[in-house]
Amino acid sequence: MLDNPLAVRRAAMDLLARREHGRVELTRKLRKRGAPDELIDGALDRLAEEGLLSEARYLESFVAYRARAGYGPQRIREELGQRGLARGDIDQALRDSGIDWFEQLRETWQRKYAGRLPNDARERAQQGRFLAYRGYSLDMIGRLLRGCDE
């Protein structure tokens, strides 16, 4: 039971030591451990002031992690939105990531389909659905599956 400010801070720091967390996610995890909201807010405010809790670092880390796993910007945007982050902050993090999304798309497609272009409409639809599910735009998918680089 997290019933004093020091215990809440320690639990929050334990979670942050493992990986970056957003404020909403950290709040949810601390509530689950039984911490009252007023102690959570105070502890997280202090951690943010000290630079130990940073939404910007969390966004940067999450975008890079999911992009390495082969997910596109639309999927990442949706996942971050579900985690309670502001749409503007998410869009800014995606822009600042420096990721070449078309190259990410190509690598994801290469891993899944070994660079084999679809032979017919059924295969094209199958590959397109997979890549759209991964979070890439239909425009980018169309360019890739037509064999165009630009």
UniProtKB/Swiss-Prot annotation:
Coiled coil: none annotated. The keyword Manganese does not apply. The keyword Metal-binding does not apply. Keywords: Cytoplasm. Pfam families: RecX_HTH1, RecX_HTH2, RecX_HTH3. NCBIfam families: PRK00117.2-1. This is Regulatory protein RecX. It comes from Ectopseudomonas mendocina (strain ymp) (Pseudomonas mendocina). The gene is recX.
